[in-house]
Amino acid sequence: MNEDFFTSDVTSLFFNSSCGIFPTIAASYPIANYPLSGLTVYFDVSKGGFTFRNSLYNGVGYNGWSKHDNPFLVRPKKDGIFNMSQLEFSYSGGNYFAGAAVHTRHYGVDPDGNQCEPDQSTKKASCAWWVYGEQKVWQAADKEIACMAQYSENTNHDNGCYRYAELGVAYTDSCNQCGLSGQYARFYQGAEYSLELTWRRSLKKWLSVQPSLQYINNRNGDFVVLCTRLTCEF
């Protein structure tokens, strides 16, 4: 999932405090979101500036290698079925996305936001939908500035997260990519606000380092998180 969806340039720059991908999906379903994996049937179709993507997954992701815990399990009756569809449009320096995901089972959460085990899930479908866009607003030689806006909701307010929004801006040149973004997520146990400042520096053509500073506020208090990402391309 992490390689097929939410991988556009500005979106993938940010670490995000809430689950990496949109939390209306990642915090609501135990799906194949890193570090979990699962089998999928995937296809995409492109024509002109449009691309349509679709992935069909087993309803639960796994990260073990035992008989009852491995990425190759397909158990729609117990785990449910999870489907993601997205339509993309590229035009004049911008990329725009709209999509929806449907899960055939409901995974409830306790007051602390902990998700129930798969065998405690119920047969109740829900949907998460999202829209987001990235648009270049300035460009000169190898330098550019792009803005990004995202919004997503889950139809079941008893899921882990039912609303998410983000605004961000990114500067890119031949050796640097810097970004600033603010996020809002409405989890079952309360709201979370976060601010992220990140800088990706290319050391060589194949090597880059990216520190990220995040400020997070939720019902448990205020937190500051420092992360670093090292990327090798070959």
What are these language model-derived features?
Residues 222-234:
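Outer-membrane beta-barrel "beta-signal"
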Residues 41-47, 88-91, 135-137, 171-173, ...:
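Residue-level signature of outer-membrane beta-barrel architecture
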Residues 90-174:
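Long, well-ordered mid-to-C-terminal structural blocks that present hydrophobic/aromatic surfaces
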Residues 1-59, 89, 159-166, 173-189:
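Outer membrane beta-barrel
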Residues 49-54, 93-96, 140-145, 175-178, ...:
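Repeated loop/turn-to-beta-strand initiation elements of outer-membrane beta-barrel proteins
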Residues 63, 77, 123-124, 153-164, ...:
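Solvent-exposed loop/turn segments connecting transmembrane beta-strands
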